[in-house]
Regions:
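Glycine-rich anion/phosphate-binding loops
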Residues: 22-31, 101
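Residue-level marker for well-ordered alpha-helical positions
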Residues: 6, 30, 68-69
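Active-site beta->alpha loop and helix N-cap motifs at the rims of alpha/beta catalytic domains
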Residues: 37, 43, 48-105
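N-terminal small/glycine-rich loop or linker at the start of catalytic domains
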Residues: 1-21, 77-81, 94, 101-102
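Short amphipathic alpha-helices and their capping/turn segments at secondary-structure boundaries
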Residues: 1, 30-40
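A short N-terminal beta->alpha junction/helix N-cap motif
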Residues: 17-24, 58-62
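Short N-terminal helix-initiation segments at or just after the protein's N-terminus
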Residues: 20-26, 48-51
Length: 105
């Protein structure tokens, strides 16, 4: 039975990053996003958005930080919405663009 109130969230990149410190290539993340979009997944959680003052970009890959530019390099406007996870106390919420300017929805 189809239930439109149920939404599907894929966290492959965000959760998988726990194993490799979010060191996925942009090409791989782009392919994952495209596959999710083709499959009709509602939300693609592409990583964390944490403050670079707390975590070193030399130690962690780009999906630990989810800069807007990196997200736009791999995702595109479609029915699948881009999401990121935030941890209270580890995120600079001022770094988020307003929703109407961001690919993160």
């Amino acid at each position: 039975m189809y239930r439109p109130e149920i939404k599907v969230v894929d966290c492959t990149i965000r959760d998988g990053g726990l194993m490799n410190k979010w060191n996925f290539s942009k090409e791989m993340v782009k392919e994952v996003f495209h596959g999710l979009a083709q499959a009709g997944v509602d939300y693609a959680e592409l990583g964390y958005r944490v403050d670079k003052k707390m975590f070193s970009p030399e130690e962690f890959g780009p999906w630990r930080f989810c800069d807007e530019k990196d997200l736009r390099d791999v995702a595109y406007e479609c029915d699948t919405k881009v999401s990121v996870m935030c941890d209270v106390g580890r995120t600079d919420y001022n770094a988020f663009l307003p929703a109407d300017e961001s690919i993160v929805k």
